[in-house]
Amino acid sequence: MTNGNGTPPETAPSPQLNVLAQYTKDFSFENPNSPASLAPQQQPPSINVQINVGASNVAENDYEVVLKVEGKAEHAGKLMFSFELAYAGVFRIVNVPQENLHPLVMIECPRLLFPFAREIVATAVRDGGFPPLMLDPIDFVSLYRQNMERQAAAQQQPS
C-alpha cells in the first residue's frame, strides 16, 4: 500500500516498555511473639494486606516504580507476624503518548513487579515458621482508579 506518491505510509514508532532493573528496596519481617506464635492454632489468623504503588521519573524516559506490600497476621488479638516490602523496578518507556504514560507506569509496571514481590512475601512468611502467604492477584486497574478518585476528591477539598 502506498500513500499516493508511490512511497509506503509512515508508521509511528511502536511503543516500548523495557525493564532495566528489579530490586528489593526495603524489606522487614517480624515474628515478635515467637515461639508461642508458631504453636498450632484452632482458628486461622486474621490477615490484613495493603498494596500501594509509587513512581518517580529518574531520567528522560526512565521511571522507578515502587510496589509497597505491607501486611500482618493476628490471632486472638496477638500479632503473629508482620511484613513490609518495597519492591522496585526501573522501566524505560518510549514512544508512548503522554496521555497514556501515567496509567502505563502505575498499572502495567506494578503488574510486572507483583509476581516477584509475591514470591518474596511467601518465602519470608514460610521462613518465619508459618505456611507461605500466597497473596491474591491484584487488580491494578481498580487500584489506579481508586487512587485517581482519591486525589481528585482531595483537590476539591477547601484549603
Curated annotation (Swiss-Prot):
Q: Does the keyword Cytoplasm apply?
A: yes
UniProt GO molecular function: unfolded protein binding
Q: Where in the cell is it found?
A: Cytoplasm
Output the Gene Ontology cellular-component terms.
Answer: cytoplasm
Spell out the family assignment given in the record's similarity comment: Belongs to the SecB family.
Indicate the quaternary assembly.
Homotetramer, a dimer of dimers. One homotetramer interacts with 1 SecA dimer.
What HAMAP family does the record point to? SecB (MF_00821)
Name of the protein in question: Protein-export protein SecB
Q: Which organism is it from?
A: Nitrobacter winogradskyi (strain ATCC 25391 / DSM 10237 / CIP 104748 / NCIMB 11846 / Nb-255)
Q: Which gene encodes it?
A: secB
